[in-house]
Structure formats: structure tokens, C-alpha cells
């Protein structure tokens, strides 16, 4: 059992190598320099090579970004989305990736793929030559689990914002031992109006570029969007939201494992993981407090929910229900592809985790509101009668 009370048996992933591309390889030169400057260039000596390499790549990205602006700038500006997006939301490690991959089986929907998200500044002009070259260095599996990875698979649009130089809580992964610099961007609730408009403009620009590529209604998946429903509805009044949730006793250890692995692979520091457990506990509360505050704002018929456990047990039934509740059209369009997808994943192996009883009690104490709302059994042999509702003023670095 590790010091954070989580014992992990990992399946899949990959072994890190210096030449493996990083999340930040698509950022422009000045965007990258700003992130390092914001953290006072506190780079570990052993990670100096990574910092220099990404800096050099940043020059190349800046050049390609200029080319894309010259070639596609006006077209992107005048492009309209086919329809307001469909947002798949939920906490990290709750099944958002699985649900995203199911939705994009529908040929009527488009999505931002991994290349677009990791090269958002120039993917329209560089994909044809750069994606195959860099693809030779890419791992075949995601670093955190047994899910396949390649440039054409759907990806979190939050990484696109990071690489566009927009502040994001994900950028804290680069300097995991430093105080958070972009905490407010998890919920967007306390972001100055000028910066919020910049965020909206960058996000919409990216979605327009994706629309040029796909020509379809876009399905997006990003856990931070769970906290941003108010802003997203301001931008996209007809947006649909699909919220997936999962047993907290499965979410917590998997999230700890996620941030530990990503900090180890993607950081310019050697992470010490101090305070990680508290960040995960607090961020979960922040996320669902923001989600519940925004829930009444969502018009009827624009939000549907599904549990990870139900989706895995009977994906066809649950997907058909989601289509019906959100009025997404004829489910028969997707049914054959969904059955094939399910068959292909029949041998999928998940990571396994063991939780120390003391950690289970702490999770039950801090997240009791979630256990009760979604009907998950609380750990036994623990008196939770006096467990408080999570503070609405809590603030912590997003995990």
C-alpha cells in the first residue's frame, strides 16, 4: 500500500522514453515561454533537456501557426458551427473517454481528434506531413490505462486550449511542485471578464477549425467542462450535455494514479506529490458544487445522465436511452457500429486498485453528498452521521 493509501495494479500504458512526444509539443514559442516564466523557470536539472526541446519545437509551431492563419484565418473566422456541441462531462476516470468513443460511432457527429488537440495552432495545414512523422514516435496505448492511442482517436479539447496558450488547470502538470497559477480556469467563475472573453474566443476558434475539418456537429469531452456549464450555455444555448458518473471508491484511486503518472511523464520538475490526495478530494467537491449550481440553468431535454456501471453492463440500452432523452435522432444509425465496438472491447482489462480502509472513510466523509445523490453505498463500519456538506468556499489546486 502506498503512502496515499492506494495500491495499484496497472494494466497497459507505456514505459516513458525521452523521445516520446509530450502534451505540450504543440504549443507556440511564446505560449511555452509564458508558462515557464509564470513559474519562474523552476525546472529540475534532469528535465532541462525536455524544456529545451519543447522550446525549439515551439519555434516550429509558431511558424506553422502563422501559415495556418494566412491560409485559413478568414475561413475560420466566417465558419459557423453546424449546431451547438454535445458535451460529455464528468469527473476524471468516470468513463468520459468510453462514452465519447461510443458517441463518435455515429457518422453524423464530428469530434476533435488527438492531432487537432495537440497541434491546434496548425493542424489544418500540417496534418498531411507532420502527423505520420510524429506518429512513428507515439506509444500505442495511453499512459494511464489499456486504452489504444493514435492521432485519429477523439481527444480532450482542454489540451487544445493549453497548446493555444490559454490558461488551463492542466498546465499545472508542467510544474506540479509549485502553487497553482491557473486555478480559476477550472470553473471560470472568478476569471476577469477580459480573460474570459479571450478564453471564449480561443475555444470557439478551435471549434470552427474542427468544423472545417469534419463538417459535422461536434461531440466534445473534457472533465473541466463539468464546472463550466454556465459559460458554455452562454456560448451555446442549444448545447446538449451528457453527464457520466461512477462509484467514488473507484474514481478516487484511479484519479490519484492519473495525476501521478501524468506529472511524472509531462512535468519539468520531479514531482513529490505532496498534497495530491487533498487536491483530488477538494477538486471533486469544487467540480460538483459548480455542476449543481449550474444544473437549474440547463433547459429541459438538454441534460442526460448515465452511470459508468450501467453503461458497461448494458451499453446498447443506455446509449439508446441517452439518444431518446436528448433527441439526438435515429439510434439505428449507430446500433450496428456500437455492437461491433462492444465486441472489440470484450477483452479490455482495467487497472485494479486497493484502498486503505482509512482512505475509504475519508472519501466517504468528504464526498458523502455524491454517494447519497447517486445511490452508491457508503463504506461499512463508519459513522457518517456528522459528516458535513463540503464547503462552498473551498479552493485548491485542480488535480
Segment roles from a protein language model:
Residues 118-218:
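PAPS-dependent sulfation machinery
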Residues 89-91, 219-223, 308:
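Short His-Asn-centered micro-motif
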Residues 66-91, 117-121, 126-127:
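N-terminal signal-anchor transmembrane helix
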Residues 105-115:
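Post-Walker A helix-loop "phosphate-sensing" segment adjacent to the P-loop in P-loop NTPases
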Residues 221-222, 232-257, 322:
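Conserved phosphate-donor/acceptor-positioning beta-strand/loop module used by diverse small-molecule
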Residues 88-105:
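Glycine-rich phosphate-binding P-loop
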Residues 226-229, 249-252, 312-315:
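Flexible loop/turn segments at secondary-structure boundaries
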Residues 1-62, 66, 76, 184-189, ...:
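PAPS-dependent sulfotransferases, especially Golgi type II membrane carbohydrate sulfotransferases
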Amino acid at each position: 500500500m502506498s503512502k496515499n493509501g492506494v495500491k495499484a495494479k496497472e494494466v497497459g500504458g507505456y514505459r516513458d522514453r525521452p523521445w516520446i512526444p509530450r502534451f505540450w509539443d504543440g504549443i507556440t514559442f511564446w505560449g511555452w515561454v509564458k508558462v515557464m516564466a509564470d513559474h519562474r523557470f523552476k525546472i529540475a536539472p534532469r528535465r532541462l533537456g525536455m524544456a529545451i526541446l519543447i522550446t525549439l519545437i515551439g519555434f516550429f509551431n509558431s511558424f506553422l501557426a502563422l501559415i495556418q492563419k494566412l491560409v485559413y484565418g478568414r475561413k475560420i473566422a466566417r465558419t459557423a458551427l453546424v449546431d451547438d456541441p454535445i458535451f460529455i462531462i464528468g469527473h476524471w476516470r468516470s468513463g468520459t473517454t468510453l462514452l465519447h468513443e461510443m458517441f463518435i460511432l455515429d457518422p453524423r457527429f464530428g469530434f476533435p481528434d488527438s492531432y487537432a488537440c495537440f497541434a491546434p495552432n496548425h493542424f489544418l495545414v500540417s496534418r498531411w506531413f507532420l502527423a505520420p512523422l510524429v506518429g512513428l514516435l507515439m506509444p500505442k496505448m495511453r499512459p494511464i490505462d489499456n486504452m489504444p492511442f493514435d492521432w485519429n482517436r477523439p481527444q480532450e479539447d482542454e489540451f487544445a486550449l493549453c497548446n493555444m496558450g490559454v490558461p488551463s488547470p492542466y498546465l499545472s502538470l508542467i510544474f506540479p511542485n509549485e502553487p497553482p497559477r491557473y486555478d480559476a480556469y477550472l470553473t471560470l467563475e472568478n476569471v476577469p471578464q477580459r480573460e474570459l472573453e479571450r478564453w471564449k474566443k480561443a475555444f470557439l476558434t478551435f471549434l470552427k477549425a474542427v468544423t472545417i475539418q469534419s463538417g459535422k456537429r461536434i461531440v466534445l469531452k473534457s472533465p473541466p467542462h463539468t464546472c463550466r456549464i454556465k459559460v458554455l450555455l452562454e456560448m451555446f444555448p442549444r448545447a446538449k450535455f451528457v453527464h457520466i458518473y461512477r462509484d467514488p471508491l473507484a474514481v478516487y484511486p484511479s484519479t490519484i494514479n492519473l495525476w501521478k503518472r501524468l506529472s511524472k511523464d509531462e512535468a519539468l520538475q520531479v514531482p513529490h506529490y505532496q498534497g495530491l490526495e487533498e487536491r483530488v478530494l477538494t477538486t471533486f467537491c469544487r467540480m460538483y458544487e459548480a455542476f449543481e449550481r449550474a444544473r437549474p440553468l440547463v433547459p429541459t431535454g438538454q441534460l442526460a445522465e448515465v452511470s459508468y456501471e450501467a453503461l458497461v453492463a448494458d451499453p446498447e440500452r443506455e446509449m439508446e436511452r441517452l439518444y431518446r432523452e436528448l433527441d439526438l435522432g435515429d439510434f439505428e444509425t449507430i446500433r450496428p457500429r456500437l455492437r461491433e465496438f462492444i465486441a472489440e472491447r470484450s477483452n479490455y482489462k482495467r487497472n485494479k486498485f486497493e484502498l486503505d480502509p482509512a482512505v475509504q472513510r475519508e472519501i466517504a466523509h468528504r464526498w458523502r453528498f455524491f454517494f447519497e445523490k447517486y445511490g452508491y453505498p457508503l463504506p461499512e463500519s463508519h459513522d457518517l452521521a456528522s459528516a458535513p456538506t463540503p464547503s462552498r468556499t473551498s479552493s485548491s489546486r485542480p488535480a
